[in-house]
């Protein structure tokens, strides 16, 4: 839902600025929330007011440009609110050490899961939005979200790196990691499962998603191995 907006936020804050402030969680949150347009209200709580003050200072210092959109909240589970995701991202940036090197050098995907084991700061245990208290719930990045990050970011990046540098070991590792991640569960994978093609891993579910977009949506059934098999079974 917020993919485009999050990309705008990422592009609006140079990575060197984030690196410069990575040891100060409040400053990281101020930069991310401020660029997302989430610090523009009049707050009564001390914490968002502190972030607001930090952001105004950092915004003037770095002359940051505001993004066009704002994160949406509609049709979202509270645990997936953009406020929670940005708070988790801030902690990840603070805790991460040489993440790209870990991707290249590690052979075990569990090392990546370990680095993605992040929990937002204490304020968010009692909030989903600024200024609105809620029952206590630890805002820990869930396994499903970690899977999604690995599937859609880490694995493609590692494979692309291997392709660019002609390093088959990176490409093989990317595919091996993809095969070790749980299959995604969505309308597309469930549809294939009903047709007799269950996804055993993220390797399968990504293949089904690609088939759906490239063949099913384009009505290229006769060019598709799965489509041809289904058509043969119907014609018998």
Q: How would you describe each model-predicted region?
A:
Residues 1-205:
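Hydrophobic, aromatic-lined core segments that form the binding pocket/scaffold
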